[in-house]
UniProtKB/Swiss-Prot annotation:
Belongs to the ATP-dependent DNA ligase family. Keywords: ATP-binding, Cell cycle, Cell division, DNA damage, DNA recombination, DNA repair, DNA replication, Ligase, Magnesium, Metal-binding, Nucleotide-binding. One of its GO terms (molecular function) is metal ion binding. ATP binds at E213, R220, R235, E264, F304, R376, K382. PANTHER family: DNA LIGASE 1/3 FAMILY MEMBER (PTHR45674), DNA LIGASE-RELATED (PTHR45674:SF13). InterPro entries: ATP-dep_DNA_ligase, DNA_ligae_ATP-dep_bac/arc, DNA_ligase_ATP-dep, DNA_ligase_ATP-dep_C, DNA_ligase_ATP-dep_cent, DNA_ligase_ATP-dep_CS, DNA_ligase_ATP-dep_N, DNA_ligase_N_sf. The active site is at K215 (n6-amp-lysine intermediate). It catalyses: ATP + (deoxyribonucleotide)n-3'-hydroxyl + 5'-phospho-(deoxyribonucleotide)m = (deoxyribonucleotide)n+m + AMP + diphosphate. This is Probable DNA ligase. Transmembrane segments: none annotated. Gene3D superfamilies: DNA ligase, ATP-dependent, N-terminal domain (1.10.3260.10), DNA ligase/mRNA capping enzyme (3.30.470.30), Nucleic acid-binding proteins (2.40.50.140). Pfam families: DNA_ligase_A_C (PF04679), DNA_ligase_A_M (PF01068), DNA_ligase_A_N (PF04675). The keyword DNA-binding does not apply.
């Protein structure tokens, strides 16, 4: 398939708000992709580079586009040719790699027409937001393959990504999907929680009775045991086994030889309250001397879900059954504190106890809900003391006075799941230490998509920041019609992706509640 054809599909998908029309356009594109192009094409239609980041920043891309000759006419580039070129760019390393990447990029752009260049630029910078979200694309894959959409979504959940599932489903149908199952030793994306304004609202939303568990201020982990082999993965599915020998020892001591558990690892003070999140995260650095750090900064694991236990997979089992399996596998002192109740006063007291012990709050869970890996579903609702949201930095302004020379005033946005875009909710320069200002300036400069000498610098929407605020008010200034009151930065969440940010629906729910 020609890149120009895929770029036109992307443009058409972005132009229509109708979900069914998006599915129809994507279905036709998937049919036209050659078998060896399907995984790449599906990835690009979802706005992701098939091979990951290629090491080309906004400044390099802008310079290459400015230097490129007039857009090419003629047969143009194929999807396969472009994928191969991007993989060569990504693989360039060592002395001279920057120049090598630029040569490959120049050669690619020289063969591309203007629509192809626009598509490539957005794809490389992570800005291809066309509304072809995984749910829509999953429906398109299901339509072309003649399979139930739920089966495609489940396979994508277990694979951690849709493109390999699309390739298998389109080539082999149901037999291809059957290969995607939960395997001990291979991580799956964790289930996530939506935000509720309070425990009363959470109980009402979950039907009156729910399980409430402390929301620990630690690092999310997924621990796998197969006999003596234990592997531990982070929230982002990076293997961190070497960083957490305490977790490895705990699982090896468990009475069951086959386990996949979901939980948190946290550094605790002598009184049992948590160390700051940043302190816990020191144990997860990429350059790590565990033997030196562990004695002074031990980690304690607390688990709250069982995905495999009792000899079988439990993803589809109700939450109450998964908890019962966890009780049989892990001692009480290594499970999160939990209360099953339908009494709002009892739930509020449980929340206050968690907050008094220094934890973030509670998570309310529907007792009959399955484990929906990779989804921020309505079956889990998190409640914190002060309102906080995980938002994405969209731009930053240069500071003045004491903050001169630092990118200071952050533009903050919530995710719109309908479009894949981010909806701005306001700005803040509050809550930042000098160290944070220095760090974010360098990080945001690397993400810049516009000139650094302008007073306002737009950036790729990649940094997730936890923001506290006092309330939400109507505001005609911003596209979503809402703004945060007295927003201040609590911390950056480098363990979260932009897709993990809170949604504009969550913000509207908090405003309406």
């Amino acid at each position: 398939m020609l890149l120009a054809e895929l770029a036109e599909v992307s443009r058409a998908v972005a132009a229509t708000p109708a979900r069914l029309e998006k599915v129809a356009l994507l279905s036709e594109a998937l049919r036209r992709l050659a078998p060896d192009e399907r995984a790449v094409g599906a990835s690009w239609l979802a706005g992701d580079l098939a091979g990951g980041r290629v090491g080309i920043g906004a400044a390099t891309l802008r310079a290459a586009l400015e230097a490129a000759p007039p857009g090419a006419a003629g047969p143009g580039l194929t999807v396969g040719e472009v994928d191969a070129a991007l993989r060569r760019i990504a693989a360039a390393a060592g002395p001279g790699s920057g120049a090598a990447r630029r040569r490959e990029l120049d050669a690619l752009l020289a063969r591309a027409g203007d629509p192809e260049r626009r598509f490539l630029a957005a794809l490389v910078l992570g800005e291809l937001r066309q509304g072809a979200l995984e749910g829509v694309l999953s429906d398109a894959v299901a339509r072309v393959a003649g399979l139930p959409g739920a089966e495609v979504r489940r396979a994508a959940m277990l694979a951690g990504a849709l493109p390999p599932v699309a390739e298998a489903a389109l080539a082999e149908g149901a037999a291809g999907l059957a290969r995607f199952r939960l395997r001990v030793g291979e991580p799956v994306s964790p289930m996530l929680a939506q935000t509720a304004a309070g425990v009363d609202e959470a109980l009402r939303a979950l039907g009156g009775e729910a399980a409430l568990e402390w929301k620990l201020d630690g690092a999310r982990i997924q621990a796998h045991r197969d006999g003596d082999e234990v592997r531990v993965f982070s929230r982002s599915l990076r293997e961190v086994t070497a960083a957490v020998p305490e977790v490895v020892a705990l699982l090896r001591a468990a009475p069951e030889p086959l386990l996949v558990l979901d939980g948190e690892a946290i550094a605790l003070r002598a009184d049992g309250t948590p160390e700051p999140f940043q302190v816990t995260m020191r144990r997860f650095g990429r350059k790590l001397d565990v033997e030196r750090l562990a004695p002074d900064l031990p980690l304690t694991a607390f688990f709250f879900d069982a995905l495999v236990a009792g000899g079988g997979e439990l993803l589809g089992a109700p939450e109450r059954e998964r908890w019962a399996a966890l009780e049989r596998a892990i001692p009480a002192e290594r499970r999160v504190p939990r209360l099953v109740t339908g009494d709002a006063a009892e739930a509020r007291a449980f929340l206050e106890e968690a907050l008094a012990r220094g934890q973030e709050g509670v998570v309310a869970k529907a007792l009959d809900a399955p484990y929906e890996a990779g989804r921020r579903g309505a079956a889990w609702l998190k409640v914190k003391r002060a309102h906080t949201l995980d938002l994405v930095v969209l731009a930053a302004e240069w500071g003045s006075g004491r903050r001169r020379g630092w990118l200071s005033n952050l533009h903050l946005g919530a995710r719109d799941p309908a479009t894949g875009e981010f909806v701005m909710l306001g700005k803040t320069f509050k809550g930042m230490t000098d160290a944070m200002l220095a760090w974010q300036t360098e990080r945001l400069k690397a993400l810049a998509t516009g000139p650094l000498d302008a007073w306002q610098v737009p950036v790729r929407p990649e940094l997730v920041v936890e923001v506290a605020f006092d309330g939400i008010q109507a505001s005609p200034r911003y596209p979503g019609g809402l703004a945060l009151r007295f927003a201040r930065v609590k911390r950056y969440r480098e363990d979260k992706r932009p897709e993990d940010a809170d949604t504009i629906e969550t913000v509207r729910g908090l405003y309406g509640g």
